[in-house]
Amino acid sequence: MQVSVETTQGLGRRVTITIAADSIETAVKSELVNVAKKVRIDGFRKGKVPMNIVAQRYGASVRQDVLGDLMSRNFVDAIIKEKINPAGAPNYVPGEYKVGEDFTYSVEFEVYPEVELTGLESIEVEKPVVEVTDADVDVMLDTLRKQQATWKEKDGAADAEDRVTIDFTGSVDGEEFEGGKATDFVLAMGQGRMIPGFEDGVKGHKAGEEFTIDVTFPEEYHAENLKGKAAKFVINLKKVEERGLPELTEEFIKRFGVEDGSVAGLRAEVRKNMERELKGAVRNRVKSQAIEGLVKANDIDVPAALIDSEIDVLRRQAAQRFGGNEKQALELPRELFEEQAKRRVVVGLLLGEVIRTNELKADEERVKGLIEEMASAYEDPKEVIEFYSKNKELMDNMRNVALEEQAVEAVLAKAKVSEKATSFNELMNQQA
């Protein structure tokens, strides 16, 4: 076997292989012997068919199969010998074949980039230092009450915490625009659903009033034709409702799994959940900065085959989220996912190199802790832990999570990490 390797472009490679004629003939004869043992031909007992008849009847197909097998096996031998690491499926390009002559073919493929991590010491990470205060718990309790609120119609003017039912028609330069009109639109004030100035224009008005407000669409608004444009909205205010918050009664508290129904018990449960969320938020904030720094410090080429594969994964995930099927998933434009796919591949390659250079393996104690932390959010944590322990795929996924955490910690060990005092609300809003 003769082998030559050339770089086509970037990570592209072409391996050209020549297989000697005698190697092909030996393999063909060997396979014909195997065929002769199995075939049934009228007039001959099984395994007793003369080789010339077997060759006459099956020679062409056997030779084709043998060539395909030799191409595959010799390519594998070649990349092992040349220490090449292909990324994605290879493309075989057979040359002209003539019986009794050497056979030359080529294989085109991409290789994984050679990653040499640099700049880890220059990565800057700001670790949030946060504690859950009594005031944070008060805010969360208020949020829980608002989620269970009832609404009661009122006669007074709408204010920042009310809910209104309106008809509205929007126009720019006197012309109505698509999506700018609605009837019986229910708007809970104070949630930032509308463009700046809209809710302020509604506040102070009563049911039965019709009025016009002037607003300006933000420069970053999603509709290109409305970015930065001044608009008028004619509004008919049909109904104003005020929020009624439930009291922290024993019955209300027990809805959240607090068996004794006490306010102290609810506060303790809320604090525990907030601290669990906080732990995850701090971890994610630090991780995202470490990975961002790693990516910026290491500019690497990425095999197109890996990006294509990741795009297919993202397509399928998107289709599943919106109830689509496999066919619909593959029809989604690749442009929607290309940037995210490339980013994921780059991060995977860089973290993979961190894992390799640090000889990391998933810490089973960490895996156990991650499962327990995740399970604590469920009503029966023991049942969840047992379910994970009996599911190999779930356990492998959690080991990957643990290994990724360990890789991030290896990056942080060399990075410049500082601490910054932050409030619970500020950190959680950053995560949103």
Swiss-Prot record:
Domain of life: Bacteria
PROSITE patterns (UniProt xref): FKBP_PPIASE (PS50059)
Notes on the domains: Consists of 3 domains; the N-terminus binds the ribosome, the middle domain has PPIase activity, while the C-terminus has intrinsic chaperone activity on its own.
Record's protein name: Trigger factor
One BP term from GO: protein transport
GO cellular component, one term: cytoplasm
Known role: Involved in protein export. Acts as a chaperone by maintaining the newly synthesized protein in an open conformation. Functions as a peptidyl-prolyl cis-trans isomerase.
PANTHER family tied to this protein: TRIGGER FACTOR CHAPERONE AND PEPTIDYL-PROLYL CIS/TRANS ISOMERASE, TRIGGER FACTOR-LIKE PROTEIN TIG, CHLOROPLASTIC
Name of the encoding gene: tig
Keyword Transmembrane helix: no
Location in the cell: Cytoplasm
Enzymatic reactions: [protein]-peptidylproline (omega=180) = [protein]-peptidylproline (omega=0)
Residues in PPIase FKBP-type domain copies: 161-246
EC number in record: 5.2.1.8
Entry keyword Cell cycle: yes
Annotated keywords: Cell cycle, Cell division, Chaperone, Cytoplasm, Isomerase, Rotamase
Similarity-based family: Belongs to the FKBP-type PPIase family. Tig subfamily.
NCBIfam families: tig
GO molecular function, one term: peptidyl-prolyl cis-trans isomerase activity
Main location: cytoplasm
Gene3D superfamilies attached to this UniProt entry: 3.10.50.40, Trigger factor ribosome-binding domain, Trigger factor, C-terminal domain
